[in-house]
Amino acid sequence: MRVGFSNPMLDACGYRAIMVTALAEEHYGEPGLFEAVIGGSFNPPIAAVRTDGVTTIALPERMRPADEKVAVRDGSIYLLSLLDAGGIDYAFEYRSVAEEHGLRWIDLPPAINLGSAEHADDYRRVHVNLGFQRFRSIGSERIGQPIVYAMTVPRNAPHPDEARMFVDFVLDAFREGKAGWPDPVRPDPEAATVYHATD
């Protein structure tokens, strides 16, 4: 079996693939699952270390696969052509991407799919430390949490009123369930909140 995921240093889908695999090891009670699917296929190997109920995965600065079992691309979207060509058997992708491209997918249980607010405490037990700090403002540690989509209107937006109107339009579309918007990203209407910053 050959698996592909995006570079965790460059794409959130990549570090989330690592988190999901670490969560799966615990959820299914399969010690060594992370090493067999991802960790053991790198040089040096990537270890999932469990201490006091938290699993930490420290990534090297450069993700170098040591064998053909794993493929890493800069963005998850670049895995699709590799999947189509038969270069990999599975790709870690968001379900919305799979739906958009007509791909088959495996539904993961809520305990590991990073999509359930009820399992937020479980997700937080997995930490991924990136091999370098890409952005000064957000640090290099990623802690598991439910995936959410967000929008903002920058304080220095040249047309803030129009930008807020656009945000309202998008939120209304989510609330109404517009055709073409995949189910996984349709939020609870009560959860969608916009904060308007004033200076």
Give the residues covered by each predicted segment:
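Exported/periplasmic ABC-transporter solute-binding proteins
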Residues: 1-199
